[in-house]
Design a protein with these regions (language model features):
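Catalytic-core helical/loop segments in enzymes performing group transfer/polymerization on anionic/lipid-linked
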Residues: 1-235
Length: 235
C-alpha cells in the first residue's frame, strides 16, 4: 500500500522499505523480504494479524494506489473473463523479475491460447492512463482484438468481474491473490515461487511453500514500514 494517489502525480508515500541486502522486486539475488518468507518465523499472533488485515483490505477494497473510483467498468457476463495486466515500460521490476518485452507478448498469447472461450481484458497501468509513461501491451492487445481497459478503476472492481489473472511482475497479481483469484506469473515478482501462483519461471532459492497469510505477514507487516498520513508518525 503506497499512497492515496499516484507517485508520478506527487502523492507522498505512506509506506517505505529499508532492505539491507537487496530489494523485493529483484529476483536475481536475495532480499530481506525473501529471507523473511523462507525463515517463516511467524508466531500465531502475527498470523492472526495478517488474517485480520487481509479481511480489512478485502472489506475496504484497498490497493497499492487508492485514488481510482470503485465502480463496475466491465459488464456482467456468463462468459469466462480473463484479466491480463500490463505494466509501465522500463519498470525495474520487469528486468529484475526475469522478464523482457517478449515476456509480455508471451503472456498475452498464452492467455488467449489457454482460455479460447474467454473474453481477454488487458488492463493498462494507471501511469500510462495518466499520460506519464508508456506500457508494453497496448498495440498487441488491439491487434489481437482484446478488450483494452484504460479506465482509472479500483482493482477490486475488476476482480469482481474476472475469473483469472495473468501478470508478469505487477503487484496487482498479489492483490488478486488476496481476492481469491487464480494468478499466473510470467516473471518473478516477490509473491511467485511459494506455491500460491501458477508460475511460468522458477527461482531455485524459493523452494518452499507458504500460505497467503505467511506471505502477507512477511511483506505487509514485517518488511514494510508505514507512516500515518495525518500525524506523519510511524505506525
Amino acid at each position: 500500500m503506497r499512497s492515496l494517489g499516484l507517485g508520478v502525480e506527487g502523492f507522498q508515500p505512506h509506506s517505505l522499505i529499508v532492505d539491507t541486502c537487496g530489494i523485493y522486486y529483484d529476483a536475481t539475488r536475495p532480499s530481506d523480504l525473501e529471507k523473511l518468507i523462507i525463515a517463516a518465523d511467524f508466531c500465531p499472533t502475527l498470523l492472526s494479524r495478517a488474517s485480520k488485515a487481509i479481511a480489512l483490505l478485502r472489506h475496504y477494497r484497498l490497493s497499492k494506489y487508492n485514488h481510482a473510483p470503485d465502480r463496475p467498468t466491465l459488464p456482467t457476463t456468463d462468459k469466462k473473463r480473463v484479466l491480463v495486466v500490463d505494466q509501465t515500460f522500463g519498470d525495474p521490476s520487469v528486468s529484475y523479475g526475469a522478464a523482457t518485452v517478449a515476456t509480455f507478448i508471451e503472456m498475452l498469447d498464452s492467455a488467449l491460447a489457454e482460455n479460447p472461450d474467454a473474453e481477454i481484458v488487458v488492463k493498462i497501468h494507471p501511469d500510462v492512463i495518466a499520460g506519464k509513461k508508456q506500457g508494453y501491451l497496448l498495440e498487441a492487445a488491439r491487434a489481437r482484438h482484446c478488450r483494452v481497459l484504460s479506465d482509472n478503476i479500483n482493482p477490486w472492481a475488476l476482480f469482481d468481474r474476472v475469473d483469472r489473472v495473468y501478470v508478469v511482475t505487477s503487484q496487482l497479481g498479489f492483490e488478486a491473490l488476496l481476492a481469491r483469484l487464480p494468478v499466473s506469473c510470467f516473471g518473478l515478482p516477490f509473491y511467485a515461487g511459494w506455491g500460491l501462483t501458477d508460475d511460468r519461471q522458477s527461482c531455485p532459492r524459493r523452494a518452499v511453500s507458504r500460505t497467503l497469510e505467511q506471505l502477507f505477514a512477511a511483506a505487509y507487516l514485517c518488511y514494510c514500514r508505514y507512516a500515518n498520513p495525518y500525524t506523519l508518525e510511524r505506525c
